[in-house]
Amino acid sequence: MSTKLFVLAKKNRKIKRLVQHINEDAELLQLWKCANVNAVDRGGISDHGEIHIRIVANAALKMLRLLVQGGVEPGVVKNHGLEQDDAELIVVLAACLHDIGIAVHRAHHERYSLFLAYPKARELLKGIYEEPDLTTITSEVLHAIVAHNAKEICLTIEAGVLKVADALDMTEGRSRIPFEKGRVNIHSISAQAVDSVDIEKGEKKPVKLVITLANSA
């Protein structure tokens, strides 16, 4: 089965064009596969390929939209005068590129992702943005990528939702491959314990996260 990205773009035409570019990019699709080989087959950790990308992209997009509905202003809107559609594109593209550095090595992969993501982001954004917005969007994407490291501070809402979305990809199916291979670690055990993760509109806060546990692990 061919690798494809599916994102709930709604009326965001920029995201629709981006997803088309991504699904036609053989190099990026292969980087996802290479990253997953290093993660699952060689590293014994949970899936970090196309399934992870799809989950993170859609989760980040949903949280961003809920935050905007709740009156939170994305960084690219506040600081660069761009629009919500641009912020949405940033989180989707950052999700698609944040783990490609694992194709090099899991350790310090955020920084490896940066040097792979810079030319790839600009390539994927051709026809969607012109300068100076092309460089602005690329810069925001790179910040979100490096800031998904637990030790890095997120300076934008876009980076923050990517970081949270990445952490929320922890349901039971994510750990199936390493767990069945007998590779029991924090990634497989924690994921085996989580039945579902739901992102909902909050009552007091813009976003509510509902995590259902299913295993005493």
Task: Report residues per predicted region.
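Divalent metal-dependent phosphate-bond-processing catalytic cores, especially two-metal-ion Mg2+/Mn2+ enzymes
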Residues: 1-24, 28, 42-51, 58-85, ...
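Short, conserved alpha-helical segments within structured domains
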Residues: 87-89, 109, 137-141
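A structural motif
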Residues: 133-140, 170-176
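Active-site alpha-helix of zinc metalloproteases
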Residues: 90-94
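Inter-helical turn/loop segments and adjacent helix faces that build the functional surface
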Residues: 123-135, 152
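Extreme N-terminal leader/targeting regions
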Residues: 121, 140, 145-147
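Surface-exposed beta-strand-to-loop junctions
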Residues: 33-39
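Post-HEXXH active-site segment of zinc metalloproteases
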Residues: 108-118
